[in-house]
Amino acid sequence: MSTEKLHLFNFGDPKIKTLHITWFAFFLTFVVWFSHAPMMAIIKEAFDLSTPQIKALLILNVALTIPSRIVIGTLVDKYGPRLVFSTLLMIGGLIAVGFASAQTYEQLAVMRFLSGFIGAGFVIGIRMVSEWFPAKQVGIAEGIYGGWGNFGSAAAAMSLPTIALLYGGDDGWRYAIGMMGVIAFLYGIIYRRIAKDTPKGSTYFKPKKHGGLEVTSKADFYFYLAMNVPMYLALAVLTWKLSPVNLGLLNDMASNGIYLILVVLFIVQVRTIHHVNKEHLAQGVPEIQRYKFKQVAVLDIAYFVTFGSELAVVSMLPLFFLDTFEGLSAVQAGLLASGFAFMNLVARPTGGHLSDSIGRRKTLSVLIAGLAVGYFVLSQIDADWWIPLAVIATMACSFFVQAGEGAVFAIVPLVQRRMTGQIAGMAGAYGNVGAVIYLTVLSFVDYSTFFMVIGASAILVFMLVQFMDEPSGKMAEILPDGTVQLIDVE
């Protein structure tokens, strides 16, 4: 494979302009989504919250992200990223203002629950960037989008406490979070005005039907149904964590009601997927339009172990340093752990660039193997380690984790152009499923075993990646007049 150099400061190039305005949109969604995190100590004191109530807020913040990434992916494919991203930014801004204005714990909980939709913003830009960049550049472009946008969570952690301090008073945190909401809302208006879904003269391909992926064989239909099950199981696990046997935010009736709703929703989704696929599967899909669903499944599972482990480790790493090394303050432990998130700025683009340069499957295989080794090394860290060496090991592991994420989304746009939003949404949802599963494991084991479980699961994923086909040749999409357009994926 070959790549062409991206001139990132050539704002006269429409695709470079699109990349910058889109990664910044994603950046703002993450600032808003994680705006509560650095303020939790202040919020806990202001509302006199218990530790279980704080934990419940953190769970609620991610509860809707799994289904919302699927929903947002479908909306992107149907309406286009410009409209969906701008709308999400404006709604997310209003939710942030609502959270900042909350007067009771119940209001805080509702707003954090709704914030899960904001976490789906990542999916939108994947489709937008893929429309503007050719296959030989899409890896690094998606990596820049994902890496720089993902930095929004770290930016929130670094800036919002200072902004709250500048406002001063007991309500400083409210002004800081509310201000981010206003900025997101205004940028949503700007994005709608200046963004375009495709380059001039290009066609924005859409699925024939909406509500589920179009698969091209009966075997893939059942494979697709099976791949939906873990997402519902993860939501059931989140419900269990909020139930009386754990945090107690939900009573038995509410918990059982949610379990029943999840079963009903799964049945409805099965019927919807059948409706989307029954006609063209009965007629037979032309060879030129076929793709293998295993490509989607492998990418989902790869994102499970990459992004899923990142979310889980970022959540526990400060406490890991604090508990492992005596004499560290909470602030020092947080700073040492921050190196894991900072790697996003360079690691994701590097993963995408390597994928463009040396091959998709080879890159993903090497990075997941490195990830496995990295977590096995972290499992050996104890109080006898030199702290700088522990930090270096953490950052090295983080590089493979986040470069792996970049490699996954270098491939996502090359499966089926018209369904890129849905494919990205499903992969993104699996990332959150991974976080739920890994954090659930952590609640039962010690730190060393936790890291070893991630490393062992990465070995399994490495083996599964070998079954993925290297994207090659061209994919076919149907123009509105019925003619076929071939899109290069090499």
Predicted regions and their residues:
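Extracytoplasmic
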Residues: 17-51, 67, 72, 156, ...
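Extracytoplasmic gate region of multi-pass secondary transporters
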Residues: 36-40, 228-257, 294-338
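Helix-breaking motifs and short loop linkers at transmembrane-helix boundaries and internal kinks
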Residues: 48, 80, 101-106, 118, ...
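Cytoplasmic membrane-interface "Motif A"-like loop-to-helix N-cap segments
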Residues: 78-89, 356-369
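C-terminal ends and interior cores of transmembrane alpha-helices
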Residues: 90-103, 370-384
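Intracellular juxtamembrane helix-capping segments at the cytosolic ends
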Residues: 120-134, 402-416
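Glycine-rich segments within core transmembrane alpha-helices of 12-TM secondary carriers
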Residues: 139-164, 425-438
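C-terminal membrane-cytosol helix-exit motif in multi-pass small-molecule transporters
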Residues: 182-204, 231-244, 259-278, 461-470
